[in-house]
């Protein structure tokens, strides 16, 4: 892509496509780094304020004991990670946490439960949590595993804004990471959520042992859905002792991570791209390159689901150095304030959203 093509991009309106080929996606991912970043940043500015980042806070409302066997996750009952299983939290405690998150600048509250799927008896307290968060003027996001049509409709009726359900990696590599469910199961749940009218938060994890082509294919799967996920979390694996993948995980090259962010931004120009789990292992310079490449959302707070996060004071300092301001929430009545999961997916001992 030459400089004339790039210059013409600046004035263009982003086109939402759902027909990306492997070759097209790979060609963008492999552009010279400066051209890739310029293209991503240009497309980013067509839909977003380049100096604004949306802030989310994540809470684990039900920890551990999960029946799934996701190879990266500390919350799986299949792995010996010394993480005790807990019962579902009291909705009142969850709502107290949401208030504190709102006061710290979060406009969205993400709640993760380590389940394969919720039981019907779990729905009443979960719905109470959603309604309580919404009453604070915040957006509510949940990640609870696979849903039935009826459960998705109940969540929609309660006012749930987002549902997180990550595809983690490419379809080809998926069975190397998770064996207790299929890639198709993930896509089925995404369709169930979208059919209920809930926005989708769906991304993946880098550092599972995948190849760069798997990262490209993961994003191509999302970009070719009938509707792009409104939120796309990109997580860096935090290897957790006791999980199978911790033994084989290899660090991701920082520039490869930034390329993945840029490709997500270019292929899904209207979606929020979240720099999710793994920021504690990233330098300020790497995070700033991610923002330059089109990331415009983070998790704030000291912890995600079961893994560490930089913390509000460190994030405030970084934002100040970069001239970034947190996105304001949408005005709501009585308020001006607006998921391993940790790989924001409840199955991620990391963070999901």
Swiss-Prot record:
It holds the Pfam family BATS. Its cofactor is [4Fe-4S] cluster; [2Fe-2S] cluster. [2Fe-2S] cluster binds at residues 110, 141, 201, 274. One of its GO terms (biological process) is biotin biosynthetic process. Homodimer. SUPFAM superfamilies: Radical SAM enzymes. Residues 51-270 form the Radical SAM core domain. InterPro entries: Aldolase_TIM (IPR013785), BATS_dom (IPR010722), Biotin_synth/BioAB (IPR002684), Biotin_synthase (IPR024177), Elp3/MiaA/NifB-like_rSAM (IPR006638), rSAM (IPR007197). GO terms for molecular function: 2 iron, 2 sulfur cluster binding; 4 iron, 4 sulfur cluster binding; biotin synthase activity; iron ion binding. NCBIfam families: bioB (TIGR00433). This is Biotin synthase. Keywords: 2Fe-2S, 4Fe-4S, Biotin biosynthesis, Iron, Iron-sulfur, Metal-binding, S-adenosyl-L-methionine, Transferase.
